[in-house]
Amino acid sequence: MTPWSSRQAPIAAPLPDTPSPIRLGLGANSRQFTLLVVVNAFVGAMVGLERTVVPLVAQADFGLVSKTIVLSFLVSFGIVKALANLFAGQLADRIGRKPLLVAGWLAGLPVPLLIIWAPSWGWIVFANVLLGVNQGLCWSTTVIMKIDLVGPARRGLAMGMNEFAGYVAVSLSALLTGYLAAAHGLRPAPFYPGIAFAVLGLVVSVFAVRETRGHARAESRQLGADAPRLGFGGVFLLTSWRDRALFAASQAGLVNNLNDGMVWGLIPVFLAARGVTLDRIGVVTATYPLVWGMGQLATGALSDRWGRKWMIASGM
């Protein structure tokens, strides 16, 4: 396999707002890339906190029996995360990537505390609104920043490593909360790790992660991308309707996340109703994101060689 360093793009011309020439490529930016992988692992761990326990908290602590009400936390999370994803890209180009990443972590800080202290189900729903902001801003921003760093040649690998870190962390966090819940109850013990995840994610993002918008500008200059850019509405129409390939990719993502939501919201309740212990529920809920994450290492790298279309079709 060709070493990462041999795949680096040429040094870009210095930009007015950067102190030194910018290099694109995984080898040239390995330290920052690794930090972003770690940050996204914390992002995944935050959402993994809820995979095993929160649907059960609805019934055990608040006496909710309606599946519609139980799933309201997931609906609030999904809507807010979708909106955060929608605007994250445009805002990242306007104000920079790092400010969005930090803002996402600030939104995530109260989440475990709200769940721990919640006197009513409404607190859980509000915690998931904040978690949706956290996930939408932080996950999207880490994706954008990794793509900025590696340049055009290895974007599949960059995405694969991002998703690997995120979903393996989801899995391990779900497994951990299952064991903590079995040993110490549904609250508060399973959510204590979330405080550490949020604080560490914020600290690394503030003090170690660097802005990558200059890398995107450098790549644009190298490629001579002087054509006028589409506005927000034009990009939205292109990706969601006008371009058939992008439309197909968008609907595939929709279906994929609908499946994920079903697994997250219903499987813990289904298993608990049949007498499955909390630690075993944790194993089941951890298996799905673990396989998802491990597969990303292969599919991300292979998509750079073989293309994306048939991998998406095979997965569907």
Language-model-detected regions and their locations in the chain:
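Residue-level signature of mid-helix packing/kink "hotspots" within the transmembrane helices
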Residues: 78-86, 171, 289-297
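Helix-to-loop junctions at the C-terminal end of transmembrane segments
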Residues: 84-96, 181, 295-307
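Juxtamembrane intracellular "pre-TM" segments in multi-pass secondary transporters
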Residues: 7-30, 211-248
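Symmetry-related core transmembrane helices of the 12-TM Major Facilitator Superfamily/SLC fold
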Residues: 189-206
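C-terminal ends and interior cores of transmembrane alpha-helices
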Residues: 106-119
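Helix-loop boundary and gating motifs at the non-cytosolic
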Residues: 27-78, 247-248, 252, 256-274
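Cytoplasmic helix-loop-helix junction between adjacent transmembrane helices
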Residues: 127-167
